[in-house]
């Protein structure tokens, strides 16, 4: 099973759109979209990873 990943190299961003495309993080939290998730990844110093696309 290949690990699912998201390219967060363009982040953090100061503001995210309201677009709803949920992702489930390794913290079992559902993030509203890639921007929200990637900002959290940056804040976690890379410890947060993607569990899967869609709600947790």
From Swiss-Prot:
MF terms (GO), sorted A to Z: serine-type endopeptidase inhibitor activity
One GO cellular component term noted in the UniProt record for this chain: extracellular region
Main localization, broad class: secreted
Residues bearing attached sugar chains per UniProt: 45
Site residues by UniProt (Reactive bond 3): 18-19
CDD domains in UniProt: KAZAL_FS (cd00104)
PROSITE patterns the record matches: KAZAL_1 (PS00282), KAZAL_2 (PS51465)
The protein's name in its UniProt record: Ovomucoid
Organism: Perdix perdix (Gray partridge)
């Amino acid at each position: 099973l290949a690990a699912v990943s998201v390219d967060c190299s363009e982040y953090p961003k100061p503001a995210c759109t309201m677009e709803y495309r949920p992702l489930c993080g390794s913290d079992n939290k559902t993030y509203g979209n890639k921007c929200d998730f990637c900002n959290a990844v940056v804040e976690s110093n890379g410890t947060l990873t993607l569990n899967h696309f869609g709600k947790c």
